[in-house]
Amino acid sequence: MIKSISWNPIFQVMGIFFIQPVVLGVWLALIPKVQSGLNLDTSQLALGLMGTPAGMLMTLHFAGKMANTFGIRKILYIGFPVYFFSITLIGQAGGLYSLLLVLFLVGVCGSLLTLALNVHAGRVEIHTRRVMMNRCHGFWSLGIMAGSFLGSVLESESTVWLILIICASASFPLALLLCLGLPSYENVNSAEMSPALVITQLPAILIGICFFTFGISMTEGAMANWASVYVKEMLGPEAQGTGYGFGLFAAFVAFGRFFGDSLKIKLGTIKVARIFVNISILGLIFLVIANDLWLALAGFALIGLGVSVGFPLAVTAAASIDDKREAPYVAFLSLIALIGFLVGPPIIGFLAKTTNIKTGLTMLFPGLLLSLYLSSKLRSSKPKKKK
């Protein structure tokens, strides 16, 4: 049995949020290198990249029930090593279909970790009576940003497989250490208290929250999958360091999330959501009209800032609807978010094949406008105090 380590629960969960996406960020920076190595065009790459969200979508169908049945701690202890190992297999992909299969496995493992982390963060927020969900996701963004910059630096130094092996090997011990002594906020009767989730009986507020998240996640998915390709298309096929565009996007996502909690307290959830969605729309306009790298980088920064608080606000709102159904509700929210993540990149890729990447990015405008319209559905949830 693993012995406990005494951690501050807030710092602990933020640390786990940071370490979880580091290797993922390395992979995202290496997408152009993998595309060149496998000789894939934009539509083929779009198809291959569908593996991750497809795996997440399939797993999230039963992830909420697994969280209640096995508990958050077991999912984290088992999920981290399998997740890191699955990402390293990307370096062994020999073609489109093997890449699709490996990324599907990454998605399966990633969905369980994502759900476990968000549910645990929500419970820490409730038990400590501290507003911290945005900061947790801020640390997640810092982690993926650090991985992206690391991947850009190492891109020309070795093979994709070796780079991923090194980064995963360094991240795993830190993840395991942070998970030791994780406080148990499990509800011992959660399996009995959480009735089956029936789509037709979902509360209207949850539906509104989910589709607010749809446009945000579609934009995040597009940036994760196409930011490096966008920069490479702008600078030329021999350009190095193309992951810096996504790194800048992730940096501003982190920046926005660190200030998101205080802004939420001062301005309220709905006003913050509207302001930030408008910022992301402005950033997308910059990307579509950019003729030089500096305007494009400004666009990446604004989009990162604009989408930064969307998902954390939605997670807090969804988790606070019903204590007995927090895991299924967060799982359903993640499902809708990942549908957005799934829909955006392939549409952009297929359109970019016949036109260019800028034209493909215009497909993000309807989703962001939907998020702007539905921002009124978010309620200003605050952590519930113990009686």
Model-predicted segments: where are they?
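Short amphipathic helix-loop junctions that connect adjacent transmembrane helices
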Residues: A29-S43, N225-G241
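Helix-breaking motifs and short loop linkers at transmembrane-helix boundaries and internal kinks
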Residues: N39, G71, Q92-Y97, G236, ...
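Helix-to-loop junctions at the C-terminal end of transmembrane segments
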Residues: T59-G71, E155, G256-G268, A352
